Amino acid sequence: MKKEKPSILLSNDDGVEAKGLNELIRGLRGMGEIIVMAPDGPRSGASGAITSEHPVKYYKVREEEDLTVYKCTGTPVDCVKLALHTVVPRRPDVVIGGINHGDNSSVNVHYSGTMGVVIEGCLKGISSIGYSLCNHFADADFSSSLPYIRRITEQVLEHGLPLGICLNVNFPDTASLKGVRICRQTNGAWINEWKRSLHPRGGEYFWLTGEFDNYEPEAEDSDHWALGHGYVAVTPTQIDVTAYGMMNELKNWNLEV
């Protein structure tokens, strides 16, 4: 009996026309049956947002051999939910978000719509991977990341991932990658996040900006260190965010009324 091709579901938060998504498609062609359900425009920073206040629609963009592309009016997470409910003929073997224009290392994982895609796939019990490049520009060069994306995806298809675990993969913006480092999430936070301006007609407005404050710049096991030294940063990420080490401490607090 002929072996079934892997089923691969893709989405992103930069929109269906983003170069990163289309480079991801190019890099994965031939690996299986690819279905894309991506937002119809940029949804960066959408995290795990879902749409509940109005209907969501989707439209077919193009269809080729082993590739069908749809665009969706909702969020990145809406895209995954809707694709699984409508256009995916069988359970995907892998859900992939990316390639994101901009890294999703450290605390960015909490804001990222690309990682929202990945976490939604993970919540559904599907092996899921997020790919991001440390370059926000629309014409970013993704070419050096594609061989690694293909290899990592092959390995996930071969081995699978444990329930509740996904991969957050970030690439430095360099043509000369030094290899792969298995990393943990860097401890840090965004500071000076708003730029204030005065409107010519009166009043003020703000643009979100900011600087990343790395609490541990010398931590060689962290994703920021790996990226800063030319390595691909692979961070296994879990959806259970329970702080188990704090549970016994809290039992000693006087929380009853």
PLM regions and their residue ranges:
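A cross-family phosphate/adenosyl-ligand binding-site feature
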Residues: K2-S11, K19-T86, R90-R91
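Short beta-strand segments
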Residues: S11, M37-P39, G97-N100, Y131-S132, ...
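Short glycine-rich anion-binding loops that position phosphate/pyrophosphate groups of nucleotides
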Residues: D14, P42, T75-P76, N100-D103, ...
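Short, Asp-centered acidic motifs that coordinate Mg2+ and/or phosphate
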Residues: V94
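Glycine/threonine-rich flexible loop motifs
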Residues: D103-S112
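Hydrophobic/aromatic ligand-binding patch that stacks against planar heteroaromatic rings
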Residues: V117-G121
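Glycine-rich phosphate/pyrophosphate-binding loops
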Residues: C122-S144
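Electrostatically charged, flexible surface regions
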Residues: S143-V257
